[in-house]
Amino acid sequence: MDLTVEPNLKSLITSSTHKWIFVGGKGGVGKTTSSCSIAIQMALAQPHKKFLLISTDPAHNLSDAFGEKFDKDARKVTGMDNLSCMEIDPSAALKDMNDMAVSSAGENGNDDLGGLLQGGALADLTGSIPGIDEALSFMEVMKHIKKQEQGDGESFDTVIFDTAPTGHTLRFLQLPTTLSKLLDKFSEITGRLGPMLNSMMGSGNVDIAGKLNELKANVETIKEQFTDPDLTTFVCVCISEFLSLYETERLIQELISYDMDVNSIIVNQLLFAEFDQEHNCKRCQSRWKMQKKYLDQIDELYEDFHVVKMPLCAGEIRGLNNLKKFSQFLFKEYDPVADNTVIYELEEKN
C-alpha cells in the first residue's frame, strides 16, 4: 500500500468538514499570498459553500493582495460569489467597544461611568494592553460561532485566517486556554461578590455571573473545535532558508503541544533553476543550490506532511487573476518543466 503523502493541498481544498484554517509562519515568507490562494481554491472547488478570509495581522495585506479595500465588516471579493474578506482593525473595534460601554452605562443609570468613558478612556486603556490584537481577533471568532448557533446574519462554512507572524499567532492560539482559566477565577469571585458587583453596575440588573457563564461556554466551544482535526488545521508557510525552517519547526512543536492539527507546509519562492535554462544565471544557480539543501531537510523532517513547493514568480502576485494562476499549484503541484511559462504570465498591477 502506497503511504506517500501528496505534495499538494487537494485534500484540504476539497474538505467538507473543516471550519477553521490557520495560515502562519515567519514574517515575509508569503503568508498572505498563501492564505488568499487557499481561500480562492476552496471557493472555486466548493461553489455551494461560503468562505471567509480574515486578516489577524495588524499590518493588513488582504486589500493589497486583492487590489480592493476591505475593512472590519465582511465583504465579498469582486469576481467571487462565495468568498468574503475582512481585516480586523483594532482601533475601530476598540472605539466600538467604548461606544457600547458608554451606551450601556447610560442605560443602567451610571452617568459617572458614562462620563468617564465618553472621552474614549476604555479604548485608550485597552489599546495599550499587550496582545489586544489577538484578543480582538478571538472576539471575531466568538461572534462567528454565536451567529452560527443563533442563525443570525451571514454565516460561513469555513473561515481562513491570514495570521500575524509566529509570536502573535501563538498568543492568539493560547487564548482559549488562558481565557478559560481566567473565567474560572472570575466565576469564583462573582460567586462571592456577585450582588455587590451588580449594584456597582447600576440599576439595569446585569447578571454578571450569567454573562461570564455564557462567555465561558463560548470559549470552551472554540477550544474543543480548535483541537478537533476534522474541524481545524494549521498550514505552515516558509521559505527554503535556515531561519525560516528553524522557526517553522518551533511553530510545529508549539502547535502539537496545543493539540492542534498541523500536517501541511507551503514552501514559497523556489527558483527551480536547473529546469529554466532560458532565464538562468550564476546567482540563480547558487541560490537554488542553497534552497535545495534546505528542501531536502524539509522532505526528510516532514515526510508525513503535505509539503507544497511553490515557484518564485517573475512579477507580483496581486489581483484576483494573478492569485488564481498562482493558487492552482496548491491543488495540483507545480511542474517546473510543464508549468514554467505560467510564472512569467502574471498581469501587471498598479
UniProtKB/Swiss-Prot annotation:
Zn(2+) binds at residues 281, 284. Keywords: ATP-binding, Cytoplasm, Endoplasmic reticulum, Golgi apparatus, Hydrolase, Metal-binding, Nucleotide-binding, Transport, Zinc. Its main location: cytoplasm. Gene3D superfamilies: P-loop containing nucleotide triphosphate hydrolases (3.40.50.300). It is an enzyme of class 3 (hydrolase). The active site is at 57. Its EC number is 3.6.-.-. ATP binds at residues 26-33, 241, 268. Pfam families: ArsA_ATPase. It is found in: Cytoplasm; Endoplasmic reticulum; Golgi apparatus. One of its GO terms (cellular component) is GET complex. Homodimer. Component of the Golgi to ER traffic (GET) complex, which is composed of GET1, GET2 and GET3. Within the complex, GET1 and GET2 form a heterotetramer which is stabilized by phosphatidylinositol binding and which binds to the GET3 homodimer. Interacts with the chloride channel protein GEF1. Belongs to the arsA ATPase family. This is ATPase GET3. The lineage of its organism: Eukaryota, Fungi, Dikarya, Ascomycota, Saccharomycotina.
